[in-house]
Amino acid sequence: MKTQKPILSALLVLMLASACGQAVTPTIEADPPTQTVTLPTAATQPSPVPTRTLTLPGAPTSTPTATPLPSELALDPDEWKSWPVQPILTSRIAEIYARGQELGNDPNAFSIFGDCQSKPEVFMGVYETDPDVIAALPAQLQETVANFTGSFNRESPTVKDATTVAGLLNPIWHEGKYTCTLDESPVECELRIHNPSFVFINTGTHWITRNQEYLETIIQQLLEAGVVPILATKADDRYQGEKTNQALANMAAKYGLPLWNYWAAALVLPEHGLYTKEGQGGLGDVYLTDQAILIYRLSALQALDSVWRAATGQ
């Protein structure tokens, strides 16, 4: 897939702060649930070697039936705060996936587009590095982990501190690492080197006014490549994070895409599961607490599980 020249011709390099810190971040413009999630108690939270399973209400606990999926979400994007934590599944997922299989996408690979909260040590790397954590999962989720082994704990050109949707479209952002070239954006490079069938879009935010436009550009690239996007809402309000979540809901409704509503999952946590890291007071509460990380990881894995099974007709 070729980089969109009209977009790249407008790229500028500016200093800005994302949800993870400050970085030289490329930008593409001149303009400046009703579902309840129960937090595990101290008695039920996994220890470093988990002895029991953390289960979130609404999570898949058995193999889905063959009931036909709806063709659209039938949810109001303006009411995204009341959307369930786990994605509403539509028939669109299987259609996108089928196209990807025709194009040769790897059915055992997923990618992540995100900032510091998407690094393997914070996000889902543990599902590849800690056998005890894996063994504590329900059998269905263990099957999902096995299917996608090799994707949970990898570094990539699309995961980096301060990554935004603007950065993902700029060849400068990958710094020429991971065999990426200056003729391809981080998105294009990741699709080439990892060839995923699914992608979590879990990026940070900044002040620019055209986030939704850039988000839609990325979504269209993924759809053209037959890759199923899994959109992820954010818990913090850094740079008006609710506007970012609104844009994600708009895109989910427009294209019939799965949305993992982590914002809703974090509602039960003190301070929304966020804290200010020492020495980084200027960023505010943007880092996940230990309690939040437990829910963050598990609810993401559950989302991957349900979307994968919808895509493959399980």
Each model region followed by its residue ranges:
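Extracytoplasmic/secreted envelope proteins and their assembly/folding machinery
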Residues: 90-94, 188, 212-219, 245-249, ...
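Conserved SGNH/GDSL esterase-like catalytic core that processes O-acyl groups on lipids
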Residues: 103-212, 284-285
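Extracytoplasmic/secreted cell-surface and envelope-processing proteins
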Residues: 120-122, 208-213, 232, 238-243, ...
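Active-site segments of SGNH/GDSL-like serine hydrolases
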Residues: 200, 204-206, 216-248
